[in-house]
Amino acid sequence: ESPLKGEEPDLEDLLGKVVNEKKFECTSDFTKIAGLDAVTLSIQTPFKNKEDLIPDFSALYEGIRNVGRNLRPGMLVVLESTITPGTTAGPASVMLEEESGLVAGIDFALAHAPERVMVGRLIRNIREHDRVVGGIDPVSTARAVELYSPVLTIGKVIPMTATAAEVTKTAENTFRDLQIAAANQLALYCEAMGINFYDVRAGIDSLKGEGITRAMLWPGAGVGGHCLTKDTYHLERGVQQLGNSDLDYPERQPSLFVLARTINDFMPRHMVRLTKDGLDLASISVKGAKIALLGWAFLSNSDDTRNTPSEPYRDAMIAAGATVAVHDPYVDHAPGISLMPSLEETIRGADAVVIFAGHHQYRSLDPCEIKTLTGKKHPVIVDGRNMVDPEAFIANGFIYRGIGRGDKNNHPVRN
């Protein structure tokens, strides 16, 4: 039985093929590294303390040292992990040299080739996305280009230095986080002004032609995952270590990128406010209320729960005295929580139904069926991903609240 969960097209078939052809092997024996031509490392690099820009590189450094102990002349080592700019040519190079007794750039090649994939699109992304590769010297760069070029079917390899590749990866995720924050902030503005964010978004997106586009992303209940929640801090740490003395920036002003992180981290708290507002209108106390939380994964149609924004929301509602039942069709287990076995059991008796994940199963929620399951005259529905038709639920007596839906969030309650 495959251990893969969620929707990952082609991955299971490809794994089965290479296993059957004996081209794929899992092992904990690091001595086998000595028989390889190239080694790639893709190990998580979280932060111990984001405020102090202190990353937890312990797992990555352990992996690097294990490679170094088994390194032989002529090999290529590639770091695929997202790392602070300067790591490949700095600490990684030093550790490999210390453990192997070899010299980076002379006895072995060393490069950075950051992964650029999304859960749910792994194989397609690997084959079709351009691949940034950067070595600590021209020979290392050329070796990395040679390694990755055959994998790409549509994308091309873009060579640069190792540090430039590190900045590219951290900056592309930082910029996406910034784009999401812009959408989230505008959604909050639209709620405050009583207008529909999605009307405004459509108007903004209509400006095209002559190379101009102002396409906006969608707002939502929060940003999760392993990458966007930390890569801003890798970039900030990189500029502090490599170029802080030369950085010309408005004095005593916070980083725009860090501010974007703050906005995105705020969105689960805004979902708490929307929930409490709805419960207040229904004359239901938060203390003792039952909340049906739909979605524990941070990404639509995925089982990836890393840094899920559902968690701070759940914690805040429990701290306020509510009971929270969690459902996710893709997640079998999550530390510290009990997942409900069915959507029906999750919603049964709920005072509020709160949508956190954009799973396709939640797009077909029927207001009549949901209301019957809750048993409430005026149940609350809070839509954090623009999944449902507000009017359909309002017409059935629901109290609706939604991210960016200032046009609906103050609707009169219908009997």
Can you say where each PLM-predicted feature lies in the sequence?
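Structural/interface elements that position substrates and couple domains in central-metabolism enzymes
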Residues: E1-N415
